[in-house]
Design a protein with these regions (language model features):
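Surface-exposed, charge/polar-rich loops and edge strands
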Residues: 2-409
Length: 409
């Protein structure tokens, strides 16, 4: 995909500001390993896994998810300060970091490579930083309180940009130094490199300033960082957010769908099927036929009774109706189940195997099985100012936290 084809590139115009920084990162000692310090993003960690992570004194979750709710923001600040004072964290010279994740994608091994630096926050209406999903205000309020007290970015947003020249990519590969290597429970290998060559760092910033950036993951973190920047006008350090940027043509840029599971006591299965069939073109099929029939915006429906359907919608000229998450939201969740009126509960799961197991155990009234979102479609809609429904995309693997922090003091 070439972003320039959509009229985004403006020769000579200054767009994003992406810079190296003097990051603080784990100083492993006394037999410590990377696993003791890092974690998935705070919003995808279950309770049991959190207990395991927080059993390690210097794990990042002891900062991002402090349990003492009354004073947790202030205590997290004190904890971070103590890590710095004790040498548990060390500060680098100004650097970019290269984050490489090797993973299995449905039988194919892929490598996703991102550049980690600090990104200057801007209002969306400036047109340089592009969102693609709606966000939850409650989550943003919690993160803003943490940011105010910490004066540090502990977790990275994930962005997509056009890319760097092959010559610059080779320079990066030749000069980056491996600092961390870790394989997680899902079999994803994480490699973290430090790049401190001033000339190469300057060249990265120069090439990025003529590009725009799509937020792939971390809308809450970005919007929180922007609000924090607006609270601190004139403070340059506080106008930046920690960001991992991946080129749009990177072969490891994989997007999974996030399936919807519905629970309700307000409509029977028979009436729900009737309502959906009047709003969409449906065909009753076996589960195997449903799985093989998923394509474009043809979605699958699995009911508690075991009945399965394929459902389609004539999208017409409106590009939003080409997005099956939008069709599911408007025609099924809101249209039939009245989820926007509180008459149904919607939960989300990106792993089809997990959804299938839950439906076999009859845990939900309905599961809506969606297709892999197209990056091109996401770009096209984002460029015309469209926000997609929450949980439209699941970029796999997630960007892990704890490899490096950005302090704004």
């Amino acid at each position: 995909m070439h972003i320039y084809e959509h009229g985004i590139f403006v020769p000579g115009a200054k767009m994003v500001t992406f810079l190296p920084f003097a990051g603080y990162r784990p100083n492993l000692s006394n037999g410590e390993h990377e696993v003791d310090r890092i974690s998935p993003p705070y919003d995808v960690i279950g309770d049991e896994y959190l207990k395991e992570l927080q059993s390690h004194t210097h794990n990042v979750t002891n900062l991002t998810l402090k349990q003492d709710a009354d004073k947790r923001y202030h205590s997290a600040r004190k904890e971070l300060d103590s890590w710095i004072e004790s040498g548990a964290l060390k500060q680098d010279e100004e650097s970019f970091y290269i984050y490489e994740q090797t993973f299995d994608d449905k039988g194919t091994q892929r490598v996703r490579t991102g550049i980690v630096g600090i990104l200057k926050t801007e209002k969306y209406e400036d047109g340089n930083i592009i969102p693609h999903e709606e966000t939850f205000s409650k989550v943003k309020a919690d993160r803003l309180n943490l940011l105010r007290d910490m004066e540090a970015h502990l977790e990275s947003i994930f962005g997509i940009f056009e890319g760097l020249t092959p010559e610059l990519n080779k320079k990066i590969s030749d000069n980056a130094r491996l600092v961390y290597l870790f394989k997680d429970q899902a079999g994803v290998e994480h490699k973290y490199y430090k790049l401190s060559d001033k000339d190469i760092c300057k060249e990265i910033s120069e090439q990025l300033k003529d590009q725009k950036m799509l937020i792939a993951d971390g809308h809450h973190r970005y919007e929180t960082a922007l609000n924090y920047s607006l609270e601190n006008p004139g403070n340059e350090k506080k106008s930046f957010v920690l960001a991992t940027l991946v080129a749009s043509d990177n072969e490891g840029l994989v997007i999974w769908p996030t399936h919807r599971m519905v629970d309700t006591e307000n409509i029977s299965e028979k009436n729900a099927i009737k309502g959906i069939s009047s709003a969409l073109t449906t065909q009753e099929v076996t589960r195997e036929e449903m799985e093989s029939g998923l394509k474009d915006h043809m979605m699958g429906l699995m009911f508690k009774s075991g009945k399965c359907f394929l459902a389609d919608y004539d999208s017409g000229d409106d590009p939003m109706w080409k997005l099956d998450t939008y069709v599911a939201q408007e025609k099924i969740l809101k249209g039939v189940y009245k989820s926007d009126e509180g008459k149904a509960t919607v939960s989300y799961d990106a792993e089809y195997g997990s959804v299938k197991k839950q439906m076999e155990e009859k845990k939900h009234d309905l599961s809506i099985i969606l297709n892999d979102p197209s990056l091109q479609t996401i770009w096209d809609l984002s460029m015309i100012g469209k926000r997609m429904p929450k949980k439209t995309t699941f970029f796999f693997p997630k960007i892990w936290s704890g490899f490096v922090f950005y302090l704004m003091r």
